A protein has these predicted regions:
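ATP/adenylate-binding site constellation spanning eukaryotic-like Ser/Thr protein kinases
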Residues: 45, 143-146, 167
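Basic, amphipathic alpha-helical recognition segments used for DNA target recognition
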Residues: 21-31, 54, 95-96, 104-153
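Short, ligand-facing micro-motifs at secondary-structure edges
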Residues: 41-59, 78-99, 113-117, 126-136
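Non-catalytic DNA-recognition/assembly elements of restriction-modification systems
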Residues: 2-32, 152, 156-176
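Short, well-ordered loop/turn elements at secondary-structure boundaries
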Residues: 37-39, 73-75, 99, 145
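Structured core elements
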Residues: 11, 20, 72, 78-82, ...
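Sequence-specific dsDNA recognition surfaces
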Residues: 2-7, 22-33, 45-75, 93-95
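Short, glycine-/Ser/Thr-/acidic-enriched flexible segments
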Residues: 17, 26, 48-50, 85-86, ...
Length: 176
């Protein structure tokens, strides 16, 4: 495996550390038959607003006429679109449901809001673009590429403060 020290994208405070995505995030793949979850809400990439982390209105698995296996996800997991990832379609699931197989349900040991904000960031997406640079067809990030991405990890209290601060600023912006 490559050495993190050779890849550090920017400086971080001494109390923080760098980690690879896979060491703090589990891609919680759990493909299920949609007919067994007909009344669950369904999230597809189209249900997530670009670059904001906002969930748009969703319909049930039955209403969306889902026929192929989808991932069962749980409230609090981050749903991340692996198709055209530079559109930055990611959201914290506000409920248990099913998501398209074109998405990854992510389970993390980090503060979920902190991870979401980092996944939506330019720093993360520059690494995504670099990881996918050899792809010529449909832009898509696979698990191996995603797992190698670096994440700056502040202490948990700072993660919470960062997430809270960003949410507060976004709330003020929304009022403008």
């Amino acid at each position: 495996e490559r050495c993190i020290d050779d890849e550090i994208p920017f400086e971080i405070p001494e109390s923080w550390e760098w980690a690879r995505f896979f060491s703090v995030v589990d891609i919680a793949s759990n493909l299920v038959k949609p007919e067994l979850y007909a009344n669950y809400l369904h999230i597809a990439p189209d249900n997530i607003e670009k670059a904001t982390g906002k969930l748009l209105p969703c319909r049930s698995v039955l209403q969306d006429k889902v026929t192929s296996p989808n991932h069962l996800f749980h409230e609090g997991q981050i749903i991340y679109s692996k198709i055209r990832p530079l559109l930055r379609k990611a959201v914290i699931a506000p409920f248990d449901g099913l998501c398209s197989a074109d998405m990854y349900p992510l389970k993390t040991i980090l503060n979920g809001k902190y991870l979401l904000r980092y996944v939506l960031s330019d720093a993360f997406n520059l690494q995504v673009a670099t990881a996918m640079s050899s792809r010529v067809k449909m832009p898509k990030i696979n698990q191996k590429e995603l797992s190698s991405i670096l994440i700056p990890i502040p202490p948990m209290q700072e993660q919470e403060g960062i997430a809270c601060g960003i949410d507060g600023l976004l709330s003020k912006i929304a009022l403008l």
